[in-house]
From Swiss-Prot:
Subunit note: Component of the Enok complex composed of at least Br140, enok, Eaf6 and Ing5. As part of the Enok complex, interacts with elg1 and the Elg1 RFC-like complex.
Domain of life: Eukaryota
Biased composition (Low complexity): 922-942, 1034-1043, 1085-1107
ZnF region ranges: C2H2-type: 23-49
Biological role stated in the UniProt entry: Scaffold subunit of the histone acetyltransferase (HAT) Enok complex which has histone H3 acetyltransferase activity. As part of the Enok complex, associates with the Elg1 RFC-like complex and down-regulates its PCNA-unloading function to promote the G1/S transition. May also play a role in maintaining the protein levels and stability of enok.
Biased composition, class Acidic residues, residue ranges: 842-857, 1108-1120
Start and end residues of each stretch annotated as Disordered: 51-111, 796-887, 901-942, 1012-1054, 1076-1301
Compartment(s) where it occurs, according to its Swiss-Prot or TrEMBL record: Nucleus
Biased composition (Basic residues): 62-81, 796-805
InterPro entries reported in the protein's UniProt record: Bromodomain, Bromodomain-like_sf, Enhancer_polycomb-like_N, EPHD, Histone_Mod_Regulator, PWWP_dom, Zinc_finger_PHD-type_CS, Znf_C2H2_type
Swiss-Prot/TrEMBL GO biological process terms: regulation of transcription by RNA polymerase II
Annotated positions binding Zn(2+) 1: 286, 289, 311, 314
Name the record gives this protein: Bromodomain-containing protein homolog
Amino acid sequence: MGLDFDAVEYCKGVKTQQSQPPFACPVRGCDRSYKTIMGLQYHLMKYDHDNPQPLTPVLTPSRKKARSRSGGHHSTPRPHKDHPTPGGGGAEARNGCSSASAGGGSASGVSARQYANPESLVSYNEEEATVTFNLDGKSVRLGIDDALPLVEDEEFAALVARGCILNADAPPLEENAPWARVQVPVARVAEIPDYRVSDAPPRPLAYYRFIEKSLEELDGEVEYDVDEEDSAWLEHMNEERQRLGLNAVGIDTMELLMDRLEKESHFQAAANGTPTGVEVDDDAVCCICLDGECQNTNVILFCDMCNLAVHQDCYGVPYIPEGQWLCRRCLQSPSKPVNCVLCPNAGGAFKQTDHGQWAHVVCALWIPEVRFANTVFLEPIDSIETIPPARWRLTCYVCKEKGLGACIQCHRNSCYAAFHVTCAQQAGLYMTMDTVKDGHNDSSMHVQKFAYCHAHTPADAKLKMNVPDFEDTRHKMKEARKALAKKRSTAPVVLIPTIPPDRVQEIATMVTMQRKKEFLDRIIAYWTLKRHYRNGVPLLRRLQSQGNNHGVIQRNGIEGSPDTGELYRQLKYWQCLRQDLERARLLCELVRKREKLKVAFVRISEEVVMLQLNPLEAALNKLLDALEARDSMQIFREPVDTSEVPDYTDIVKQPMDLGTMRAKLKECQYNSLEQLEADFDLMIQNCLAYNNKDTVFYRAGIRMRDQAAPLFVQVRKELQRDGLLARSQRYHVDHVEAEVEQELRLLLAAPASEGIVQKLLILADKSQVLKNPTYRTKKIKQIRLEISRMRKSLQKARFAARHSSHANQSQSDDEDTLGGSPSKKRTRKRFNSSGVDMELGHDDDDEEEDSDEDSMGEDTVSKDLLNSTQTPPCSPIKSLNNSSSPVGINRRTAILLTRKAQAALKRPSEPLTTPVKEEQHNSQSSNTQSTSGSSSSVTTAATAASSGAGTLNHVLSSAPPTASSFALTQNNSSGGGALASGTGIGGSSSAGTAAAASLTSTALAMNSKLSANLPVKSPKRPGRYRRVPEVRHSSSMSPKKSPNPAVTVSQALPMPETLPFERIPDSFRVYRANNQRDVSDSDDAPSQSSSPCSSCSDFSMSGSCSDFDSDEASEGDADGDPDRDGGRSRSEERDSTSQEGTTDAMDMQHASLNNVQGNNGNMAISSSSGGSGGSSSEDDELEERPLSARQNKPMKVGTRGTPTPTTMARAVALSAGRGRGKRRSNLSESTSSTATPPPLRRAGKLRSATPNASPLVNNIKARRNTTAAGSAPLTNNNRSKHSEDSASSERHNNHSHGQKPALEPLQLVWAKCRGYPWYPALILDPKTPKGFVYNGVPLPAPPTDVLALRKNCLDEIVFLVLFFDVKRTWQWLPANKLDILGIDKQLDQQKLVESRKPAERKAVKKAYQDALHYQSQVSDLEGQGPDPIM
C-alpha cells in the first residue's frame, strides 16, 4: 500500500509553508524527521511504510555477555584491556587470543560501530545523536556518547592473521540485514529442441566505407531539398503555366535552381568579404556565468551560427563536440527569433521549456521555482507554472517593465527591490552562486545564490568589483536601461543576398524551359523572400556554419596575416621544442657512442684474453682473415660442389678450401704455421691441377698464390719475433730455392758455352715456380744477367773467329756492309736465324748497359743454337714437371706436350714423311747462318765449329744445294736489322736445282749490299714488358698442310736418326710464362702463331716457342679460310698494326714480295708493310695491288715453282727501293720463291668472321678439320684459286684500311644504344631454337616480342644482340653500332672507361667479365661444367 498523496507536491507545499527544519514525515506511525526537504522527499518516495524496518540495529547492552566468536562479532565495543569484561577474558585466553579483549574489542571498535546502509535514511533525532564517517566507501556511524578504543595497525594485522578477527572488512552488525543479503542470480536455462546454429552469411570481400565528400565536390552537387512551401509555390506556378499553355517545371529543376542560387550568393559574400554574422571575440566570456576562465573539462564553446559563448557545464554539454556545434536556438529555430518567457530581453543562451516555449538558462537558474528535468543536459526547463503570481507582478527597477517575466528580489531581507535576471546582468549587479556543504551531513552539497541591488552590495564585493559611488551607479543604470530598450526595439539584421546578372545568366544556361527569363525572375523573388523570412539564414544547413567565419577569414587573408603575434608565438614554441628535441637526440647519440665504446672495449678485452691463452690461434686467425680478404670473388671460400663438377674427385684426391681451413682452425687442429701453409698450398695445387690455364679460376689461383706468399712471410716474422715459432721451423728453406741456388752455382762455375746458356734458360724457367715473389724476381734477374754476359762473350769469340777465317768471293761486300757507318758510336745488328739473336757491336764496354737492358725484362731467348743444342732424355726440367699440373701448364697442355714428345721420340723408327717445308726450313736455318756471318757457307760452318756449334755444321753439310733460296726479313722487335733466309722448295729436276743454287749466291750478294747501304737504327721500345698483341707466326707449316705431299725426305733432305730427338729442345718441354708482361686482369688473350704445334714441329724463324707462346697460341695457323689449300691468300698477309706501339719480330718474316700462284708460272708479288704509320701513299698504292700487276707483265719462271734469278733480283731491287724511303728501319722485305703461299700474318687481334665465338675453338676446329683431311693434293685450277685469293685480298685490304670485319652470329661485340655506353653483347641468330647448346653452353632463344620488333627496321640490316647486363636485354642494332670485342685490348679498355658515371663503369666492367667468362666456357672442351648464359 503506497502513499495516498503526491510526495513531490507535498514537499513543495512544506517548503513554502515551513521554512525552518526539522521536517517531519506526515505518515501516521512514522516519527522520522529530516533537516532538508530533499531528505523528506527521498524518504517519502523510497521508504516502505507498510513494512517498516529499523534503520539502525539494536545495540546490545554492555551488561550482557558477549557472544561467542563462532556466532559472529561482538555487537558492543569491548572495554579497554585494563577493564576486561566479566567472564570474557578466560574464554579468550583459552583460545590463545589473550589480547583479543583489547585488540579484538579495539579492532572491532571501528568495525563494531554501526555501518550505515548508504541507501537507508535516518531520522532527525538519530542523526543528532551519531557521528558519521566514510571508511573505504562505507558510512560508519558512531554514537556521540560511546568510547573510542584504539588499536594499532600491526596489532590488528596480527589478530586478523591468527584468526581472532573474522571477516574484518564486512559490516558485522548489519550483515543479516535484508539489503546485505546479496544472492547470486540463478540463471534459467531451457534447451530448445532441434536448434541449429546456421553458418554465417557470405560477406563481401571489401568493407563498405563512407567517404565524406570534399567542399569542392559538394559545391558541384545539388544539396537543396524542397519543403512544403516550395511544393505549394511550384504547384501554383505550374497551374499558371498550364493556363498559358506552357510546360510544367519539375521538382528537380527547382532544386537545381535553388541550390545554385544559395551557393552563388554564398560565394559572392565570401569574395566581397561581407560578414554574415557576429565576429568571434577572443575575450568573450560565458553569457551565463559571466566568467571567461575555462578548464580542460569545462571549456567555452562558441556557436558556429550566432557565436554564442557558453561553458560546457553552464549550458549542459557533457562532451566537446567534433566539428560543427550549434546552440539550441540556432539548431531548432534558425530563422525564427525566439523570446524568453521569464524576461523581456532577447539574445543569450536559450533552452526550450516542457511546453515548447523558450527561456534563458540563466533565468531558469536564478528563479527558485524553476527546475531542469535533466540536470546533465539542463533541458527541458520545467516547473514554470509553480512560480508564484507575485513574481509575475513585480516591477524591474532596471528596465521599469512590469508584468513581463518573473523577477527576483534583493537578498537583503528589508529590501524589496526586484529585477529581471538578464537586466541585473546588463546593469552589473552583484550576483553570485556558491556551493557549500551541509553543516550536519558532509555528503550533501547545496548551492547558495546571492543577488543584491546596487544599494546593498556587500562591502567586500564593492572592493572586488570596483563599484563606483551612488551617482555613478544611477548613471550606469540609466545607460543599461537605454541599451536594453534598444535591444528590444531593434529588429535583427537580415542580410539580403545579391547575385550579379552575369552569374544569373550562367545559372539560366543549366536548365531548358519555355519563357525561362520570367520563371527565373519569379524564383529569384521567391528565394529572396524566403531568405528574408529566415532572417538571412542560408537555406542549406552546410552553409549556415561556413558562411559566418568564411567572409572574415577571406577579408583578413586579403588585408594581411590573421594574427601575426599568435603566429610568432607558435613559431617560438616550435623552435624551443626543436631545440629540446635536438638536445635529446644529442644525448641519445652520446649514449649510443658510449655503449659502442663499451662493446668495443669488451671485444678488445676478449681478444687480449684469447691472445694470452692461445697466441698461435690468434695469429692464424688473422692470417686466414687476410687470405679470405684476398679472395675477392669468393672462389676458395666454400668447398667445390661435386654436383656441378662430377669429375672433380677423380682429379683432386684431397679437396681443400678456406672454409675447411677455418673449421680446422676452430677445432684447434693446426699446431704450427706449416700445417696451415700446407693446406693452403694443397688448395692452390688442386685449383691449378683441375682448371685450364685460360679460365678465371686458374688465374685466381695464381693471383691467390702470389698474394699469399708475403702474408705467410710476415706472419712467420711476427711469430719469430714473439718467440712462438719453433727453432726447427724458423730456418725453413724452400727445397726449390735450394735446388735453384745449387744448380746456378754449378752452371756459373762451368766454362761459357751454348749448352750452359741453354741450361741457364731452363733454370730461369724453373725459377718461375718459386713461392717468394721477391726472391723469384731477384733470382730471374740474376740468371738473365749471367745469360747476357755469357752471350756477349760467345759473340765476341765468334766475331774474332770470323775475321780470322778465310774470306770468300763476297767478302768485299760484307766488309762494306760492316764498315758502312764508321762514324756511329754504336751499331747493333742482330742476325736472326731460326729465332737466334746475334749482336754485332763496335763498343766492347757496353756490357753494363746491355746487362741493365736485359735485366729490365728482355725475355727474348737466344735461338741461334736451338738446332745444335739438344736436351738429353733426362732433362733437369723433368723434376719440375713431376706434379700433376706444374705451374704455368694446365692439364691439357701437359698431356699434349707429353704425347707430342713421345711421338717425336718414336719418329726415327717410322718411315719419314716430313714435308718439304721442314727440310726447306732446316736448309734455310743453315743457309741463314752462313749468309749472316759471311757469304760462304763453308766459312760459316768452320767458324761455327770453332765456336762450339757443331750441329749447325752437321745440318749445313747435310742440306743439298737444291733446297737453297733467299728472303729478306727484318726483326723490328729485336731492335736491329737482321738477315734471315726464306723458305725454299725442292725441285724435281736438275735444272731447277742449278737455277736455285745460282739464284742463292746472287741474291745473297745483293742482300749484303742492300743491308750495307740502308741506314740501321734501333728504335726505342716504349713498352719493354708489354705483351705484343700481334700474332706470332712461323714460316714453317704443319706436316698435314704441306702443299706437296708427294715429296718425301729421300727426295728433299736426308735426316739422321738422332734428328727427331735433337729437334726437341728444353724450352719445348716446359711452358715458359713471362711474369713481367702486361696481362689484363679480365682476360689473357691467347697469343697466336702460324705454326700449328710449337712443341713438336720444327723450329721456325719467328721463334714460335718464345716465352709468350702457349699451347693455344701454337694452334693459330689452323684458323683461316676453309677454301685455301696448303697456304693463305696473298692478300691476307697485310696487317694493320697501327694500334700497337711496337712491331713484332715476326711481322717482316712473313711479309713476302713474291708469291707464286699455281703451276702455269704466273707469279704475283705482294708487299706488306711492317711499320704502323711510316709508309707513304705511294707505298699504300703498291700494297693495294700485286707487284706483277704494277709491272704490267707476268713473271716467267724457269722450272716448276722456281723463279729465275732475274725475277728474284728485280723483286729484291724493288723491295730495297721501297725500304729506303721509310723512316723506320725496314732493312728489306722478305721474298718467297715457294709455290705455296706463306702463312697468313693476322692484322693485330682481328678475328675471323666465323660463327665461333672464341679463337681457341676456331683454332682447334680448324686443326681437327686439317687432321681429318690429311695431306690433300693441291688443286690445279689456277683460275678459281686466283679468283678466291683476289676476293680474299680485297676483303682483307678493306679491313686494313679501317673497315670492320664481317659480323656473324655467336660473336662477342661492343654494342651501343642511345643513352647508354658501349656494352658487351653477343650476336645471336634470330632463328635460334629453344634449348640450343653451343659447345656445352645453353643459349637462350629470342622471345617473340623481340622478334616482332624486327619489322620496325626493315630498311637497314640489323643484328640481334643479347647484352650481358643484369636483365639480359635484347636489341636490334645496325653494324655501325657494333664493334668486335676482344680484338684490340686498347679498344676494350677505352670502352670500359668511356662512361663518366662510376655506376655505369662498374656495370660495364661486370658485363665485360661475364662476356669473357662466356668465351672461356665455350672454349672449354674438357667439359668443366659451363653454366648457361642466362
